[in-house]
Amino acid sequence: MKKILKNKFRVFKLDFIDPIELFRKFETYSNLVFLDSAGPLGEDSRYSYLAVDPLYRIKVQDKKTYINGKEKKICLRNTLQSLLNICSHNKIKGIPHFQCGLSGYVSYDYCLNIDNIPQIDKKKNNFPDLNIGLYDLVFAFDLKLKKTFLFSLDLDDTKYSQNLEPHITRRKRLLNFYKLPYITHSIQNNNKLKWKQETSKREYKTKIKKIISYINNGDIFQTNYTHRFTAKKPDDLSDNLFYLSYRNKTKTPFSAFLNFGDVSVCSFSPERFIKVDNLKVTTSPIKGTVKTSSNKIRDNVLKENLIKSEKNLAENLMIVDVLRNDISKICIKGSVKVKALAELRTYKNVHHLVSTIGGKLESQKDILNLLISCLPGGSVTGAPKIRAMEIISELDKSKRGVYCGAIGYISFSGDADFNIPIRTASIFNNQISINCGGGIVADSKIESEFRESIDKISNIIKDRKRQSKENNKRIVIK
């Protein structure tokens, strides 16, 4: 085991282990963050990270903020920046980018506070709006070079331990877990989940018509409408097993599993929200979707139709404009450019049109401001953004939770990477919930939009009983 000293930041080079093997060893831990590049190997699916035992855990729930379980009256933004200021070390090149720091999720509903969007009363749900840990120990994986590291940030235990074991003790314990022999576990999920559709087909049609009327009246050009499925979690189905059983069926580059004790998040997202690498900003919104076909000729036709679709291209252009405006507020003037427009990308069950916008930050301290400026993502709100969010707040039947918020990390080295948690299930109070939706524009066809929304989560919800009747609100899957 090789150790490299860099200020208080240490890098331990370990024998390579598959991230899933290590995840299975730590799966009973709470406050666990597993940022899982599960897609086909590539630049978007090169690095994975696993972190447990945060020095600090910040939770926002029912409009109250808790630090390590104690309610605090704080300015969240200032607190997060103060935590990042604990240690700002120079990035070590040639190793994965999350070199200790903050990691967790921000919900869509918390983002409404940023833009002062009124939250219309929804069904009672005290799902935590934010869960973020400050991690001084992070396992990192370079899947391309087959390397595993333990990143360690040695801090003054008397000042930062917050009643945890001393840093060195925790590091030794994590390394001992790493060395444990791996026992192969079955990831077969034999549970038959009964998914309940929260919004009936009739309600869905009514709300899409309402959105189109807003568009025709000039309120908006596009908005993202979503609906939810829920299922009771069987007693013998663990949260991590639910994640693993669908991970290989989705194979997305920005997958993640987070377990904060009272809530778990299983994200199978294909969409990058914000990446910061050496102060260079990248955002890659998705707009434009069609289901794949096992018939190669048919699949090629579907791809060609998607690429040539004026409707989908128009949706994509609108959202590119929203994201370009959002990052321009923080990036250096003149640095924001559209790098790619409506490129076709293929995932396990759908084809998408993906655009890429880039910019440059002045300093590391702009990262939080960048996130605040961009949250929630333009691809899951609409255009103009604020009015679209107001309409979403009016029409959504339930709070979105982590869906359409953000999951990722901010490294002490100044890098950051967040997904937009679409194709994401939340497990809370023994209930599994998953949302699906899409952008609605003036010429949207209601039946087509409904089917497209279901297609997006078809690898998670395998609906054997197609909903041929409006009142049939149950989909049975196995």
Language-model features and meaning:
Residues 1-478:
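Extended alpha-helical targeting/anchoring segments
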